[in-house]
Amino acid sequence: MAWQGLAAEFLQVPAVTRAYTAACVLTTAAVQLELLSPFQLYFNPHLVFRKFQVWRLVTNFLFFGPLGFSFFFNMLFVFRYCRMLEEGSFRGRTADFVFMFLFGGVLMTLLGLLGSLFFLGQALMAMLVYVWSRRSPRVRVNFFGLLTFQAPFLPWALMGFSLLLGNSILVDLLGIAVGHIYYFLEDVFPNQPGGKRLLQTPGFLKLLLDAPAEDPNYLPLPEEQPGPHLPPPQQ
């Protein structure tokens, strides 16, 4: 019964958050069970473009390291802030949310080439947190019961925490930079004098992922209208 309740609760999670979180957990579980090796997952441009191992363009965003404190810490923030974005500013805009993932992933991959970064999942997490924090500037965040501050400081607090754990902050900086580029192009520049929205979600994504817009001129059939329905007249 507990598993059924947990499964039912998980199915209530928005689709993109559910899919990405599940993919990360399953990838890590496969590595832990030695079904996969991290060497099969990391981003390597030579193997991608010369050996056509194109799955590495995706799998490097799914592996957050072996099971341990760092993995659960990252999964907590991925799940929480991905869900808050999907249920908040991207509510009813699944295609736009997926496009943000694609835009961020492509830009991180290109910039990651300069720094020889092999796994970019943590950068994607930092991007999600950054975009949420800029769209929720008045929200106060309690950081593990130790500090309370305004949401825009959260990405920097996470970067400092990574530094305390002995991790490189280059990945966090990359995620923050890409998150800022997305936020500027999507939320800031279109509202400037002479500005316009430069990021346009492709139509095929909207067709696949978003519910069709309702036609304001559509008149439902009598049997589709609310209220009691009279039986058709006898012939």
From Swiss-Prot:
User: Membrane-spanning residues where?
Assistant: 23-43, 59-79, 99-119, 158-178
User: What drives induction of this protein's expression?
Assistant: Up-regulated in response to endoplasmic reticulum stress via the ERN1-XBP1 pathway of the unfolded protein response (UPR).
Q: What's the short name of a Pfam family annotated to this entry?
A: DER1
SUPFAM superfamilies attached here? Rhomboid-like
Cytoplasmic face of the membrane: 1-22, 80-98, 179-235
Q: Topological domain, Lumenal: which ranges? A: 44-58, 120-157
Keywords on this record? Endoplasmic reticulum, Membrane, Transmembrane, Transmembrane helix
Q: What does this protein do?
A: Functional component of endoplasmic reticulum-associated degradation (ERAD) for misfolded lumenal glycoproteins, but not that of misfolded nonglycoproteins. May act by forming a channel that allows the retrotranslocation of misfolded glycoproteins into the cytosol where they are ubiquitinated and degraded by the proteasome. May mediate the interaction between VCP and the misfolded glycoproteins.
Protein name, please?
Answer: Derlin-3
Q: Which gene encodes it?
A: DERL3
